[in-house]
Amino acid sequence: MEKIFNYINGELVEPLNNQWLDNYNPSIGEVYSLIPDSTKEDVENAQKAAKNAFPIWINSTIKERATVLQRIADLILERQDDLAFAESVDNGKPLALAKKVDIPRAATNMSFFASAILHENSESHQMSQVAINYTLRKPIGVVGCISPWNLPLYLFTWKIAPALATGNTVVAKPSEITPMTAFLFSKICIDAGLPKGVLNIVHGLGPKVGYEITKHPNIKAISFTGGTLTGQKIAEVAAPMFKKLSLELGGKNPNIIFADCDLEKAVSSSVLSSFSNQGQICLCGSRIFIERKIYKVFKEKFLIKVKSLTIGDPLEKSSKIGALVSQQHMEKVLTHIEIAKKDGGVLLAGGNKFIPEGRCSNGYFLEPTVFEGLSYDCSTNQEEIFGPVVTLTPFDSEEEVLNFANSTKYGLCSMVWTSDLKRANRMSLKLDSGIVWINCWLVRDLRTPFGGMKESGVGREGGSYALNFFTETTNVCISYD
């Protein structure tokens, strides 16, 4: 059986304890590879390698760093088919989605930040007849990057690219549930000529590896994407140590449909924002609020499209809905579905485990599920389910839907569908969201800030925000006298 290895000091190495964890293919429900069950000692070796590599990496020129990152981006695209296949097998997502979104965006992350550091501006402030100030931005040193299982390579590169670009060295932990593309990425780094120790990847469990990365005194910053509860635990450990923290956490995002919208576009996009990646995207719009005068027609059109989605083998071109990432996660989502039923939810579509014919009959598949008749403040509309489950709720006014939308502890993103520009501006101002999409969803410009309010996280990623996070600022004041 294939083994995944840690990537430490430029080498692919076994865990020091020679202990391994099972890695499942969720579409067939079987173990297909083994990953390191790494411990404190592996993290220690990784941080030592990163610490030793830092003087070399920081003294490389910006152009040299950019060249290596761009070479990595090019190799990702050259190996796109292999990476997409690995992502689909490891995660359960449709192969077509991995080819179209995950892998190309991973390459774009690397190339974007390779280019960004070549065009970054510095600041200066002149004090008339007195002095001039200018600002230096310096890499932090060794930083930790912990990435999730839903968009494995995409979000892994989203973190390490700006960290490396700004001159830091990295100890990274990909999710133990979907480690394969990070392992393949380590081979790409070797082939691209990334200096030894600049990036170190330690596989294993969060309570072991993630905890050790978070609490290590030589790791000066933590960038984490994942669940809110895990983010809280990271903050509890890292904050007293005065580490820089970037936490991109959960979401329970409202999708608001006004009567004056482009209905066909709103319906089609709402299907995507509900069920892409089996609803396992922090940006999915799981609470759909529809202005009452178009509620019935929206519901009819939406359900027709939902019921036409093809569920099945992720490797088949026709499959739009793949497997959930694990049996444990599938059971969690099924529990939420039962809670929604007990709370009086009317099941309009789905609600059951799906058993495909053929090789995937033991996989972790769920039907896309739609409820109506639930109160805006019930647990289904308040807790992040992170699966193919959405609710439909009518509203009568802007004031009412704003109350619905802002009622959760989360504040990651919102979608608003309207042809009224003034309304769009009013809603954007009043929604508790780090991102507001007007008449679209998941349109991303990597220069823009990405992150949420409330319990959806701390800080922002993307563009200059990411570059600033991974650097420390020094102001230099020079007297004219």
Roles of regions detected by a PLM:
Residues 29, 65, 87, 110, ...:
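Residue-level signal for inorganic ion chemistry
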Residues 122-265, 395:
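Rossmann-like NAD(P) dinucleotide-binding subdomain of oxidoreductase/dehydrogenase enzymes
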Residues 54, 58, 73-80, 84, ...:
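Structural signal for hydrophobic packing residues in well-ordered secondary-structure cores
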Residues 30-120, 130:
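Glycine-rich loop-to-alpha-helix module at the N-terminal edge of alpha/beta enzyme cores
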Residues 28-34, 219, 256, 310, ...:
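Conserved C-terminal structural/oligomerization subdomain of aldehyde/semialdehyde dehydrogenase
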Residues 1-34, 67, 71, 121-146, ...:
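Terminal low-complexity tails and localization/encapsulation signals of metabolic enzymes
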Residues 221, 229-375, 438:
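ALDH superfamily catalytic-core signature
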Residues 31-38, 52-59, 145, 255-258, ...:
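Short, well-ordered beta-strand elements within core beta-sheets of diverse protein domains
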